[in-house]
C-alpha cells in the first residue's frame, strides 16, 4: 500500500509539474547570453500520465482481458491572441478510443480537465469537461474532439524590464560575469517562474486510473 501511494503521489506531482517546450522559450546560444525570450502565450501540453485512460469491466479488475475501453488524447493544437492586455489561448484536441466488445451501438463519456498552471506548479484555474465517444454497432474505434481555453494577464506573463535586460545583455570574454549564467541567479529564476504560464489538458483520472497509468 505504501508503494502504491508513493507511485500515485509521484504521478500527481508529474501531472502538476509537467511543462512543454514551444517556440518562444528561452534559447541559450553556445552557453553565452540569451538569444530569444519566451512568448507571453501559455505553452500547451499534456501532463505525464494523464494522456491515456483505461476502463475495465468488471470495474475492479485491471487485467488485460478485462479492458473495456482505452482512449488517448492526441493532435493537440493551440491558438493564441496576445494583442491586448488579456492573452487568450485556446486549444483543441482529439480523443481516439477503442473498445473490446463491438456488439451494439454505445456511447462513452470520458472526463477531462484543462488547467492553467503558473510557475510549473501553481494551478490558478481548472475546468472539468467531458467528451462523448459514439461507437456504431460493430465498430471498435471512435473519436471525438475536445476544447480548452485560458486567459492570462499580459503584465503577469511579461518579464520586468530589468530582468529582461540582465538576461539578454551580451557577455564578452573578459567581463567579470562572462562565465555566469544569468538563469542561475535566484531572483531571475523566480521572475521567470512567475511569468511562466501553461495550459494543460488531460483525462480527469481517479486515483486507481492514475496508479494504473504510472505502473503499467
Go through each PLM region and give its residues.
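Beta-strand elements of well-folded, non-transmembrane domains
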Residues: 75-82, 91-101, 112-120, 133-137, ...
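Intrinsically disordered, low-complexity, charge-dense segments enriched in Lys/Arg
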Residues: 10, 147-208
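Short, solvent-exposed beta-strand/turn "edge" segments of beta-rich domains on protein surfaces
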Residues: 61-69, 77-89, 99-106, 120-122, ...
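Post-signal peptide N-terminal segment of mature Sec-exported envelope proteins
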Residues: 29-56
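C-terminal motif of bacterial Sec signal peptides marking the signal peptidase cleavage site
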Residues: 16-19
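Bacterial N-terminal signal peptides that target proteins for export
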Residues: 1-9
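Bacterial signal peptide processing site
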Residues: 21-24
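An exposed acidic His-Trp-rich patch
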Residues: 106-159
Amino acid at each position: 500500500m505504501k508503494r502504491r501511494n508513493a507511485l500515485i503521489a509521484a504521478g500527481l506531482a508529474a501531472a502538476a509539474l509537467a511543462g512543454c517546450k514551444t517556440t518562444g522559450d528561452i534559447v541559450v546560444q553556445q552557453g553565452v547570453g540569451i538569444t530569444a525570450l519566451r512568448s507571453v502565450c501559455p505553452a500547451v501540453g499534456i501532463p505525464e500520465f494523464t494522456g491515456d485512460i483505461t476502463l475495465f469491466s468488471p470495474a475492479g479488475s485491471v487485467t488485460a482481458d478485462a479492458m473495456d475501453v482505452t482512449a488517448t488524447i492526441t493532435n493537440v493544437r493551440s491558438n493564441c491572441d496576445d494583442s491586448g492586455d488579456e492573452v487568450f489561448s485556446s486549444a483543441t484536441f482529439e480523443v481516439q478510443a477503442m473498445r473490446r466488445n463491438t456488439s451494439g451501438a454505445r456511447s462513452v463519456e470520458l472526463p477531462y480537465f484543462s488547467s492553467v498552471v503558473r510557475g510549473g506548479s501553481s494551478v490558478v484555474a481548472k475546468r472539468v469537461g467531458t467528451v462523448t465517444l459514439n461507437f456504431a454497432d460493430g465498430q471498435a474505434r471512435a473519436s471525438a474532439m475536445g476544447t480548452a481555453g485560458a486567459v492570462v494577464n499580459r503584465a503577469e506573463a511579461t518579464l520586468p524590464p530589468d530582468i529582461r535586460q540582465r538576461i539578454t545583455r551580451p557577455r564578452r570574454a573578459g567581463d567579470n560575469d562572462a562565465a555566469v549564467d544569468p538563469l542561475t541567479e535566484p531572483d531571475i529564476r523566480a521572475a521567470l517562474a512567475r511569468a511562466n504560464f501553461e495550459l494543460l489538458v488531460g483525462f480527469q483520472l481517479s486515483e486507481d486510473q492514475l496508479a494504473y497509468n504510472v505502473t503499467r
